[in-house]
Amino acid sequence: TQVYDGLQNPLPKLAEQCGFFLERGVYLDPIPDKEWEFTPCVKPGDAVLAGDAVGSVPEGQFTHLIMAPFDLKDEGWRVKSVKEKGVYHVRSTVAVLENGAGEEKALSMVFSWPVKQPIRCYEERLRPDETLVTKIRCIDTFLPVAKGGTFCVPGPFGAGKTVLQHMEAKNADVDIVIVAACGERAGEVVEVLKEFPELTDPRTGRSLMERTIIICNTSSMPVAAREASVYTLSLIHI
């Protein structure tokens, strides 16, 4: 599933369960409830810190790292046990960490993190040092954008803000496209849902939708739900 609402509910599954009228308090797991292939990156006895890779899981053309919890407080944690390479359920325990006091933490292939809580266990903050090629002449020539940078497109109704967003999503030199369609943008995202599956990704030769994630919240949804899309987007891209 690659289309979500602001709370990261997968919209196709939400439609199957609720139909056209959303029920109060519905929340679905954004991670597919199935088995995945796990490959360990550590062995029993290895020391680990917050954010260290414990294993990896492939999904399509990408490889996800299974990391030690971001909130590990001290440096005394070690790998007590880890699963061998194989296929396991997404919620199954694949590794167990233990500190000097005997406290244990069981790790599965997924864990939750508050969307508004910053992640501080990084070694270095990378600064933008490479130009993002969008293949849109007016941007690449007159207003070049750095990879990891930010730019804004203001304008009145009909100025072409959404068209520019869609063109950039189709042509930009990036590994994955994440579109946060909040408000009016979500009403126009239907074009993306119809067009992207039919477009061929020049980098992989596969469907462009395979590396695209869309978060939809229309103007009729509460402001809080639309605001949540921004936080959800910022966490997904990590």
Regions found by a protein language model. Name each.
Residues 136-184, 234:
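P-loop NTPase nucleotide-binding module
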Residues 236-238:
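Conserved small/polar residues in nucleotide/adenosyl-binding loops
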Residues 167-209:
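Conserved P-loop
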Residues 8, 53, 58-60, 99-100, ...:
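Short, surface-exposed secondary-structure boundary micro-motifs
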Residues 2, 45-47, 53-56, 87-93, ...:
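Residue-level marker of beta-strand positions
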Residues 17-36, 66-68, 92, 96-149, ...:
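P-loop NTPase nucleotide-binding/switch module
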Residues 1-49, 53-55:
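Accessory, often N-terminal, substrate/partner-engagement and coupling regions
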Residues 30-49, 64-89:
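Short beta-strand segments of a lipoyl-like beta-sandwich/carrier module
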